């Protein structure tokens, strides 16, 4: 991904989990989420994710993700990209957030923030919830981090989140587009032209936000992402970091909506 972005002179935003890689424990979703196995089969998960990811935290011991390679993270920032939080224990947050106490939620965020500070020597300015999973406890705990913005949800446009009747001060910039792995798992002709499916999801004049997972877009799907970037630019779209979008939104004087956050599928 870094090579692609450098060749296209793109500055992007990277959200990194800083705790253990326990991806293999996501196997419980086979029993808890109807259709999960079918989606993984259509996605071709072993080939796209690799056995290291699929077995990590089960048959293969967990290793830290961001914290294990501070040199890589510093090189990402040195190339002009933004680096933000993507939780601490990604699988625990994504699968068990609703069971965590307010203290446990705050601790997950605090551990990620401390790891970030240990690498970059400064406080994080942005966060994206693992699996777009959030709730009232998480949003309230996140308020204490002093973030510039967060990207915790799927939606249509930037907004101020409302919790228990209170408008929070951390701007939300939602992901507006489908991800590549979602497109791969869809039925129908989109699978034969995923870059065109992405192109069709762009809304002219809007803040389009695309999330790409490094293990997919930086691997077997890299040619698809490369082609999508070319097609989008040919149609006049520019690509920037989310922190630049947040600064533009906050500096525009636009009256942003205040919205509650609900569970989607």
Walk through the language-model features, giving the residues of each.
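Catalytic alpha-helical scaffold of carbohydrate-active enzymes acting on polysaccharides/glycoconjugates
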Residues: 1-126, 131-171, 190-210, 217-265
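Positively charged, amphipathic and often flexible ligand-engagement surfaces
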Residues: 157, 172-189
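Short Gly/Pro-enriched loop/turn and capping motifs at secondary-structure junctions
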Residues: 178, 215-218
């Amino acid at each position: 991904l870094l090579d692609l972005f450098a060749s296209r002179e793109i500055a992007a935003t990277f959200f990194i989990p800083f705790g253990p890689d326990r991806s293999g424990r996501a196997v419980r979703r086979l029993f808890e989420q109807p259709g999960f196995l079918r989606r993984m089969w259509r996605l071709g998960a072993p080939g796209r994710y690799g056995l290291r990811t699929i077995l990590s935290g089960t048959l293969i011991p967990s290793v830290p993700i961001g914290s294990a390679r501070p040199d890589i993270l510093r090189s990402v920032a040195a190339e002009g990209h933004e680096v933000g939080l993507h939780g601490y224990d990604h699988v625990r947050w994504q699968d068990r957030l609703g069971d965590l106490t307010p203290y446990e939620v705050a601790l997950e965020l605090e551990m990620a923030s401390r790891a970030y500070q240990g690498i970059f020597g400064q406080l994080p300015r942005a966060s994206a919830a693992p699996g777009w999973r959030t709730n009232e406890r998480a949003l309230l705990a996140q308020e204490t981090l002093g973030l510039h913005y967060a990207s915790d949800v799927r939606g249509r446009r930037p907004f101020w989140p409302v919790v228990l009747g209170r408008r929070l001060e951390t701007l939300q910039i939602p992901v507006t587009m489908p991800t590549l792995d979602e497109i791969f798992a869809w039925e129908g002709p989109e699978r034969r032209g995923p870059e065109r499916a992405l192109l069709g999801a762009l809304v002219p004049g809007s803040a389009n936000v695309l999330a790409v997972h490094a293990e997919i877009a930086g691997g077997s799907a890299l040619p698809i992402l490369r082609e999508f970037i070319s097609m989008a630019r040919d149609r006049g779209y520019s690509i920037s970091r989310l922190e630049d979008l947040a600064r533009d939104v906050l500096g525009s004087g636009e009256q942003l909506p205040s919205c509650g956050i609900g569970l989607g599928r």
